[in-house]
Each structure stands twice: as structure tokens, then as C-alpha cells.
Design a protein with these regions (language model features):
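A short core secondary-structure module
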Residues: 91-92, 100-101, 105-151
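A short, Trp-centered hydrophobic/proline-enriched beta-strand micro-motif
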Residues: 71-79, 123
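Short Ser/Thr-interspersed hydrophobic loop/turn segments at strand-loop and sheet-helix junctions
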Residues: 4, 27-32, 123-124, 140-145, ...
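A generic structural signal for well-ordered coil/turn residues at beta-strand boundaries
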Residues: 73, 89-91, 115-118, 135, ...
Length: 185
């Protein structure tokens, strides 16, 4: 982690190498010659942190990118829902602003590594009056709060890398919103 190999293309100021995508390909080919498990870090390093680097505030980038790249924090994506699967526009998990905080209610499914994650990148509906491709917002969710229940989904082989995640009045402070309100699509 200290050498920045977890983030070959990610900026140096956040713990990456700041190299080109072709260098990432070369590294991946070389890494393939060894047993180098990435497992629970793959979603965070491959999807969540790149999204944060593209759309988050500078404060959010500083707070979340470096610990993830150093293997100190695990992330999951909270996107797919029962009844909508990969149709993200069909999301019905709610984020309602009450007393200056976002209150989250709903469910996600097929969430890889949620049972290990400290943080989740959450897509939730913030405006029900808009068409389904609008009114969606991104948030950073603290997965360790009591209002978040993670249930691993056992596969036929006995492993459980996927999960159902339930939110019952989970709380998110406004500074954990990523990008603008309604900019989740």
C-alpha cells in the first residue's frame, strides 16, 4: 500500500502512483503472475474511490481516498435493489432531509463485500416528483451504524460475498453527499 500499487492511475496526493492507464494494464499483467488477493478491496479501489475522485469535494477526496488506497478502509457500492436489479433509475431507497440530516430507508441487494465494509457509496432517491432518471443522489454511508443491517447471501458453494442491506432510518450528515443534489444519474 505504501508504494501506491493499489492505485496505479490514481493521483499521488491521495496515495496513488499518478501513472497512465497503460501502466495499470502492465501492472495488472505482472501482478497476474503472483498470488496477490485483492478481494474485499476490489469494489472500493475499482469503483467507489474512482467515482469519489471524479465527483467528490476536495475534503471528501482527502478523507476517503488515502485510507482506501492504503487498505485501511473497505468500501461497497449500494446500487442494486430488489425489483429493479441493475436498472438504477428504478431505485426506491429514500433519502429524506429531516432536521438538517438525510434519513435513509430502503434496501439494496447483491452488494459485494458489504459485510466487511466501513463505507458504502449509496444511490438514493431524493426527489419523488421528478422522472425516474432524475431525483437520484449519491451519498457516503457509514456502514457501521446500527440503522444499517447487512445480511450475507449464501451461495451454493457456501461462500457469501454478496449481501442484502437494509436501511431503517440510517442517518447521513449533509457533508456526506457526493456531487450535487439530484446529480446521481
Amino acid at each position: 500500500a505504501a508504494a501506491g500499487f493499489a492505485g496505479i492511475t490514481m493521483p499521488k496526493e491521495y496515495g496513488g502512483q499518478g501513472l497512465s492507464p497503460i501502466m495499470q494494464v502492465i501492472y495488472n499483467l505482472e501482478e497476474g503472475n503472483f498470488i496477490a488477493p485483492r478481494g474485499v478491496y476490489e469494489i472500493g479501489l475499482g469503483m467507489c474511490i474512482p467515482t469519489m475522485l471524479a465527483y467528490a469535494t476536495e475534503e471528501q477526496k482527502q478523507r476517503y481516498a488515502t485510507p482506501a488506497l492504503h487498505g485501511e478502509e473497505i468500501w461497497c457500492q449500494l446500487f442494486s435493489e430488489p425489483g429493479s436489479g441493475s436498472d438504477l433509475a428504478g431505485a426506491v431507497t429514500r433519502a429524506d432531509l429531516k432536521n438538517g440530516k438525510w434519513i435513509i430507508n430502503g434496501q439494496k441487494v447483491w452488494t459485494t463485500s458489504a459485510h466487511h465494509a466501513q463505507w458504502g457509496l449509496l444511490l438514493a432517491r431524493t426527489d419523488w416528483d421528478l422522472p425516474k432518471h432524475k431525483g437520484l443522489s449519491y451519498f457516503v454511508l457509514d456502514m457501521t451504524q446500527d440503522a444499517v443491517e447487512v445480511q450475507p447471501l449464501k451461495q451454493m458453494n457456501g461462500h457469501a460475498s454478496f449481501n442484502q442491506v437494509f436501511f431503517t432510518d440510517a442517518v447521513i450528515d449533509p457533508e456526506f453527499q457526493v456531487e450535487g443534489l439530484g446529480d446521481g444519474w
